[in-house]
Protein backbone atom coordinates (compact mmCIF):
# COMPACT_ATOMS: atom_id res chain seq x y z
CA UNK A 1 0.00 0.00 0.00
CA UNK A 2 1.35 3.40 -0.97
CA UNK A 3 1.36 6.18 1.55
CA UNK A 4 0.31 9.62 0.49
CA UNK A 5 2.72 12.31 1.52
CA UNK A 6 1.23 15.18 3.47
CA UNK A 7 1.25 18.59 1.86
CA UNK A 8 0.38 21.94 3.42
CA UNK A 9 -0.50 22.88 6.96
CA UNK A 10 -3.24 21.66 9.22
CA UNK A 11 -5.95 23.97 10.42
CA UNK A 12 -4.54 23.89 13.95
CA UNK A 13 -1.10 24.96 12.74
CA UNK A 14 -2.59 27.87 10.79
CA UNK A 15 -4.64 29.04 13.79
CA UNK A 16 -1.56 28.93 16.04
CA UNK A 17 0.48 31.01 13.57
CA UNK A 18 -2.35 33.55 13.18
CA UNK A 19 -2.68 33.82 16.97
CA UNK A 20 1.06 34.45 17.34
CA UNK A 21 0.97 37.15 14.64
CA UNK A 22 -2.03 38.75 16.38
CA UNK A 23 -0.23 38.88 19.73
CA UNK A 24 2.88 40.40 18.14
CA UNK A 25 0.78 43.00 16.30
CA UNK A 26 -1.03 43.91 19.53
CA UNK A 27 2.34 44.65 21.13
CA UNK A 28 4.19 46.30 18.23
CA UNK A 29 1.52 48.57 16.68
CA UNK A 30 0.75 50.70 19.78
CA UNK A 31 4.47 51.12 20.44
CA UNK A 32 5.10 52.24 16.86
CA UNK A 33 2.17 54.70 17.01
CA UNK A 34 3.54 56.11 20.27
CA UNK A 35 6.87 56.84 18.59
CA UNK A 36 5.14 58.46 15.60
CA UNK A 37 3.12 60.74 17.92
CA UNK A 38 6.23 61.62 19.94
CA UNK A 39 7.97 62.56 16.68
CA UNK A 40 5.10 64.88 15.71
CA UNK A 41 5.18 66.54 19.14
CA UNK A 42 8.95 67.05 19.02
CA UNK A 43 8.71 68.48 15.49
CA UNK A 44 5.96 70.91 16.56
CA UNK A 45 7.95 72.04 19.62
CA UNK A 46 11.02 72.57 17.45
CA UNK A 47 8.97 74.50 14.87
CA UNK A 48 7.51 76.82 17.53
CA UNK A 49 10.93 77.51 19.00
CA UNK A 50 12.46 78.13 15.56
CA UNK A 51 9.66 80.51 14.59
CA UNK A 52 10.17 82.54 17.78
CA UNK A 53 13.94 82.68 17.23
CA UNK A 54 13.49 83.69 13.58
CA UNK A 55 11.19 86.56 14.53
CA UNK A 56 13.38 87.59 17.46
CA UNK A 57 16.53 87.73 15.33
CA UNK A 58 14.95 89.59 12.42
CA UNK A 59 13.01 92.07 14.54
CA UNK A 60 16.17 92.60 16.60
CA UNK A 61 18.10 93.55 13.45
CA UNK A 62 16.24 96.83 13.33
CA UNK A 63 18.62 99.67 13.98
CA UNK A 64 18.43 101.27 17.40
CA UNK A 65 16.64 104.58 17.24
CA UNK A 66 14.79 103.90 14.00
CA UNK A 67 11.04 103.93 13.74
CA UNK A 68 9.40 100.72 12.57
CA UNK A 69 5.89 99.28 12.44
CA UNK A 70 5.49 95.58 13.11
CA UNK A 71 2.20 94.20 11.85
CA UNK A 72 0.85 90.99 10.35
CA UNK A 73 2.25 91.74 6.89
CA UNK A 74 5.75 92.30 8.31
CA UNK A 75 5.59 89.11 10.39
CA UNK A 76 4.43 87.09 7.36
CA UNK A 77 7.21 88.60 5.24
CA UNK A 78 9.89 87.75 7.81
CA UNK A 79 8.66 84.17 8.17
CA UNK A 80 8.26 83.58 4.43
CA UNK A 81 11.73 85.01 3.76
CA UNK A 82 13.86 83.59 6.57
CA UNK A 83 12.13 80.48 7.89
CA UNK A 84 13.27 77.17 6.47
CA UNK A 85 10.95 74.18 6.52
CA UNK A 86 7.23 73.95 6.90
CA UNK A 87 5.53 73.83 10.27
CA UNK A 88 2.27 71.96 10.82
CA UNK A 89 -0.64 73.36 8.82
CA UNK A 90 -2.64 75.93 10.84
CA UNK A 91 0.33 76.88 13.05
CA UNK A 92 -0.15 80.52 13.96
CA UNK A 93 1.75 83.47 15.38
CA UNK A 94 0.01 86.16 17.36
CA UNK A 95 1.37 89.47 18.58
CA UNK A 96 -0.16 91.15 21.58
CA UNK A 97 0.96 94.47 23.00
CA UNK A 98 1.12 94.62 26.76
CA UNK A 99 1.79 98.35 26.81
CA UNK A 100 3.50 100.92 24.63
CA UNK A 101 6.92 99.55 25.54
CA UNK A 102 6.78 95.75 25.25
CA UNK A 103 4.98 93.14 23.18
CA UNK A 104 4.41 89.39 23.40
CA UNK A 105 4.95 86.95 20.54
CA UNK A 106 3.03 83.70 20.80
CA UNK A 107 3.43 80.70 18.47
CA UNK A 108 0.81 77.95 18.65
CA UNK A 109 0.78 74.62 16.84
CA UNK A 110 -2.33 72.51 16.23
CA UNK A 111 -0.32 69.47 17.39
CA UNK A 112 -1.37 68.58 20.92
CA UNK A 113 0.66 67.36 23.87
CA UNK A 114 -1.35 65.99 26.78
CA UNK A 115 -4.55 67.30 25.16
CA UNK A 116 -3.34 70.91 24.85
CA UNK A 117 -2.04 72.72 21.75
CA UNK A 118 1.72 73.25 21.87
CA UNK A 119 2.39 76.96 22.41
CA UNK A 120 5.51 79.04 23.06
CA UNK A 121 5.54 82.71 23.95
CA UNK A 122 8.03 85.40 24.86
CA UNK A 123 7.76 89.04 25.84
CA UNK A 124 10.18 91.54 24.30
CA UNK A 125 11.17 95.13 24.91
CA UNK A 126 12.59 96.42 21.62
CA UNK A 127 15.63 98.67 21.42
CA UNK A 128 14.28 100.60 18.45
CA UNK A 129 11.18 102.76 18.22
CA UNK A 130 8.76 99.99 17.39
CA UNK A 131 5.05 100.37 16.85
CA UNK A 132 3.41 96.98 17.28
CA UNK A 133 0.05 96.30 15.70
CA UNK A 134 -1.69 93.31 17.35
CA UNK A 135 -2.20 90.61 14.72
CA UNK A 136 -2.44 86.90 13.95
CA UNK A 137 -0.48 85.25 11.12
CA UNK A 138 -1.37 81.68 10.08
CA UNK A 139 0.57 79.08 8.08
CA UNK A 140 -1.77 77.68 5.40
CA UNK A 141 -1.15 76.04 2.04
CA UNK A 142 2.62 76.39 2.33
CA UNK A 143 2.81 80.10 3.16
CA UNK A 144 2.40 82.54 6.02
CA UNK A 145 -0.39 85.08 5.67
What are these regions (language model features)?
Residues 1-2, 14, 35-38:
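Amphipathic alpha-helical segments that mediate coupling or scaffolding at interfaces
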Residues 33-52:
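Aliphatic-rich helix starts adjacent to a transmembrane/signal segment
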Residues 47-66:
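N-terminal alpha-helical signal peptides/signal-anchor transmembrane segments
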Residues 1-9:
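N-terminal leader/signal peptides at the extreme start of proteins
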Residues 8-11, 23-26, 35:
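ABC ATPase nucleotide-binding domain "signature" loop
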Residues 15-31:
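Alpha-helical hydrophobic helix detector
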Residues 63-135, 140-145:
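Extracellular/periplasmic head regions of type IV pilus-like filament subunits
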Amino acid sequence: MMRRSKRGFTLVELIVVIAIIGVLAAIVVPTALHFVNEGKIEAAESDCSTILRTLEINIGRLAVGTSYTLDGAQVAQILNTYLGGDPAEETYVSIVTADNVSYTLSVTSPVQKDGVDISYQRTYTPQSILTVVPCVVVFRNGTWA
